[in-house]
Curated annotation (Swiss-Prot):
Catalyzed chemical reaction(s): L-lysyl-[protein] + 3 S-adenosyl-L-methionine = N(6),N(6),N(6)-trimethyl-L-lysyl-[protein] + 3 S-adenosyl-L-homocysteine + 3 H(+)
CDD domains: AdoMet_MTases
Cross-referenced HAMAP family: Methyltr_PrmA
Name under which the protein is recorded: Ribosomal protein L11 methyltransferase
Species of origin: Cupriavidus metallidurans (strain ATCC 43123 / DSM 2839 / NBRC 102507 / CH34)
Major localization class: cytoplasm
Function field: Methylates ribosomal protein L11.
Length: 304
């Protein structure tokens, strides 16, 4: 059985209504994407730590509806526009989707990934290429972080090169938990992961258990205001700038901060946001993304 995808670009405030209308009119699935994804205009959706996102769609949103081959998408789009009192009917594009063994296709897109010198991220349906390496068994799922994105790889490379045995670690915006898990496998001590998304917290706990790693994962409001030897945050530049004071305060004096999710052109402004507390510099770049690192100045010696 073949399928059809109908793609409509709409304004932010219409995204949820169009999604509901298309689904009610027979779409098999509906997703909303950033129409500016992978461009300089790409927008993150985020809220302050512990709060819900303030926006549910992007300024330019793309609604993608899937239909079976017997449905006429033109009639559905027209009916949805009428139901929403939208005139004229917005332009849309159609593209065919051939039926396939979707499980096998998905699995074929995720091969083991080597990161740094000795780290391998291995999906559960593959054997580890090097059993003596640092192996992370991780499948694509609900939360960001499988090692395929340059920002994740950069953070993992930094950890491999710099983590010290027994250091305490905070992974802020932990996603899948991959950075917390690799830190533990590289010898870190007590490790905590924080995310504002409950699904990410659940995914991190599951992945830690699968990898036989002891680490704690929780929502921000459930974690004490402790300081750590290492704080790593792989998010995006705007939330990193907003959280500069908070993240800097979670680094103990003499501890280190690692930031990624930052484009090369954004590195200077992110570093400037942290300058009052921690001097940050670019450690390494990859495919236009950077990893920044810095050390919090040690507390002045007591001269009394």
């Amino acid at each position: 059985m073949a399928f059809q995808e109908c793609v409509i670009e709409i304004a932010q405030e219409q995204a949820e209504a169009w999604s509901d209308a298309l689904f009610d009119l027979g779409a098999l699935s509906v997703s909303v994407e950033d129409a500016d994804a992978d461009t300089p205009d790409e927008q993150p959706l985020f809220g302050e730590p512990g709060l819900e996102p303030t926006r549910l769609a992007w300024n330019r949103s793309r609604v993608v509806a899937l239909f079976d081959e017997e449905t006429d998408p033109a009639l559905v789009v027209t009916a949805a526009a009428n139901a929403l009192k939208v005139d004229p009917v917005p332009p849309y594009a159609l593209r065919g989707v051939e039926d396939q063994d979707w499980v096998r296709l998905t699995q074929s897109q995720f091969e083991p990934i080597r990161i740094g010198e000795k780290i391998w991220v291995v999906p559960s349906w593959h054997d580890a290429p090097d059993p003596d390496a640092v192996i992370l068994e991780l499948d694509p799922g609900l939360a960001f972080g499988t090692g395929s994105h340059p920002t994740t790889r950069l953070c993992m490379q930094w950890l491999e090169a710099n983590v010290r045995a027994g250091e305490t670690v905070l992974d802020y915006g932990c996603g899948s938990g991959i950075l917390a898990i690799v830190a533990k496998k590289l010898g870190a001590g007590d490790t905590v992961g924080i995310d504002i998304d409950p699904n990410a917290v659940d995914a991190s706990r599951y992945n830690a258990e699968r990898n036989r790693v002891e680490a704690s994962f929780a929502l921000p409001e459930s974690v004490s205001e402790a300081t750590y030897d290492l704080v790593v945050a792989n998010i995006l530049s705007n939330p990193l700038k907003l959280m500069a004071a908070m993240l800097s305060a979670r680094v103990r004096p003499g501890g280190r901060l690692i930031l990624s999710g930052v484009l090369e052109r954004q590195a200077e402004e992110v570093a400037a946001a942290y300058a009052p507390w921690i001097p940050m510099s670019v450690w390494r770049s990859e495919e236009g993304w950077v990893c920044l690192h810095g050390t919090r100045p040690a507390a002045p010696a007591d001269r009394s």
